[in-house]
Curated annotation (Swiss-Prot):
Disulfide bonds: none annotated. Belongs to the FGGY kinase family. One of its GO terms (molecular function) is glycerol kinase activity. Inhibited by fructose 1,6-bisphosphate (FBP). This is Glycerol kinase. Key enzyme in the regulation of glycerol uptake and metabolism. Catalyzes the phosphorylation of glycerol to yield sn-glycerol 3-phosphate. One of its GO terms (biological process) is glycerol-3-phosphate metabolic process. Its EC number is 2.7.1.30.
Length: 500
């Protein structure tokens, strides 16, 4: 297999990307194309499934041809994707019956509330590890069946297929032959029993979704089939699938119980490997499947923070305090601390572990001496505080102590933020050389399936450190900072509750 590469396809919320990796886990080539965000009504978010496919196929070809290679140089393809986003298509024509309903879409919130009022939340969580929420795929499928003319009849006749984005890509890469998904994507639908690792008939009946619509669920690392499209002339094994955050956990080599990664993007996604048994959260975290390789299934706890890097964009676009996002580090570093200013960026409510949809963004501790730099510092601090809230919940749920925090995503390049994160946590924040961990995780899963890499130990040995941030803040100062943050969060929640 000399001079062969693994192609990782990273289908995200705003763009489709493709990366070629060599045997050492280095990026050889990269291609990216953005696509349209569709907002038919407030709270609704859609994508065109055909545009998802065309952009992903396009960048896959581009990443390969840019290096002067062709399909014969590709040993395998790994797919990672935005999770929960829901596509329903006609099995005969291959055409979607409606746009993809994106994970952020809230149109089914009222329906979710009605399910909760029926007292179903405990049952759903026990089976799936998930709360009842419009975030997940199940109620999106139900909406399509209820609102697209003729969809329910076709579904009953077995003529419709549902898939998350990974399924849709595999379906198209194999010319409508394979209808599969992996356990990680299945575990985000609110229809999959994470204990039996089967679609749950009781939940399907409850939501009136025919089982015939659903893809076959496979491991995250196995040869599912081969490409049959015009994208590549040769047949290439499709050999790895994982949802984006699961792939990032694997790319960070968080392969043993208690290891944690935090992806600092527009929001933050924190995931802890909890080993071979699911842990039910008592602190509003999500229980999910981390990945499956062969018969080995690893589970995880996950917490999502809605606004992280987005708070920096707000300082740039909303307030005009900075011209580019990169400027925030220098501005924030121009003062030694936030001078008692706390920003709670609950612009869209609070995510884990609070799950308060009504809370709104709040600023506390402002005085006549407060400057733009203090606000910039408070904004960065808020990302670290929110992450700490989730990590504390993970430790409480799992009974495991976090030894270090592996970090990736755009904002992990901010040294000031990473240092403050380590200070708050009291353990090292560790940044790898390759921060494209989502694509790397998909590449590793595909490569392991075909023997491109021999085993997990070989892959583990490739993880390389860029920088380690060790905690240096005195404990009393950390406690003062945390007490102020907790006061600010309580006040932000009280502001929302008083409006009732």
């Amino acid at each position: 297999m000399q001079d062969q590469y693994i192609l990782a396809l990273d289908q995200g919320t705003t763009s489709s990307r493709a990366m070629l990796f060599d045997r050492q886990g280095n990026i050889v080539s990269i291609a990216q194309k953005e696509f349209e965000q569709i907002y038919p009504q407030p709270g609704w978010v859609e994508h065109d499934p055909q545009e998802i496919w065309s952009t992903q196929a396009g960048v896959a070809a581009e990443a390969v041809t840019r290096t002067g290679l062709n399909g014969t140089s590709i040993a395998a393809i790994g797919i990672t994707n935005q999770r929960e986003t829901t596509i329903v298509w006609d099995r005969e024509t291959g055409q979607p019956v409606y746009n993809a309903i994106v994970w952020q879409d809230r149109r089914t919130a009222d329906f979710c509330d009605s399910l909760k009022k029926q007292g179903l939340e405990a049952k759903v969580r026990a089976k799936t590890g998930l709360p009842i929420d419009s975030y997940f795929s199940a109620t999106k499928i139900r909406w399509i069946l209820d609102n697209v003319p003729g969809a329910r009849d076709k579904a009953r006749q077995g003529k419709l297929a549902f898939g998350t984005v990974d399924s849709w890509l595999v379906w198209n890469f194999t010319k409508h032959e394979l209808h599969v998904t992996d356990v990680t994507n299945a575990s985000r639908t609110m229809l999959f029993n994470i204990h039996t690792r089967q679609w749950d008939d009781e939940l399907l009946e409850l939501l009136d979704i025919p089982r015939s619509m659903l893809p076959e669920v496979k491991a995250s690392s196995e040869i599912y089939g081969h490409t049959k499209t015009t994208v590549f002339a040769s047949k290439i094994p499709l050999a790895g699938i994982a949802g984006d955050q699961h792939a990032a956990l694997f790319g960070q080599m968080c392969t043993t119980s208690g290891m944690v990664k935090n992806t600092y993007g527009t929001g933050c996604f924190l995931m802890m490997n909890t080993g071979d048994k699911p842990i039910e959260s008592k602190n509003n975290l999500v229980t999910t499947i981390a990945w499956q390789i062969g018969d080995d299934v690893q589970y995880a706890l996950e917490g999502s923070i809605f606004i992280a890097g987005a708070v920096v964009q707000w300082l740039r676009d909303g307030l005009g305090i900075i011209k580019t996002a990169a400027e925030i580090e220098a501005l924030a570093a121009s003062v030694p601390h936030s001078d008692g200013v706390y920003l709670v960026p609950a612009f869209a409510g609070l995510g884990a572990p609070h799950w308060n949809a009504r809370a709104r963004g709040s600023l506390f501790g402002v005085t006549r001496g407060t400057r733009d730099a203090h606000l910039a510092r408070a904004a960065l601090d808020a990302i670290a505080y929110q992450s700490l809230d989730v990590l504390a919940a993970m430790e409480a749920d799992s009974g495991l102590s976090i030894g270090e925090l592996r970090v990736d995503g755009g904002a992990s390049a901010n040294n000031l933020l990473m240092q403050f994160q380590a200070d708050l946590l009291g353990v090292d924040a560790v940044r790898p050389q390759i921060t494209e961990t989502t694509a790397l995780g998909a590449a590793y899963l595909a490569g392991l399936a075909i023997g491109y890499w021999k085993n997990l130990d070989e892959v583990r040995s490739q993880w390389q450190l860029d920088r380690r941030f060790a905690p240096s803040m005195p404990k009393q100062q950390v406690e003062r900072c945390m007490a102020g943050w907790q006061r600010a969060v309580r006040a932000a929640k009280a502001w929302a509750d008083d409006a009732q």
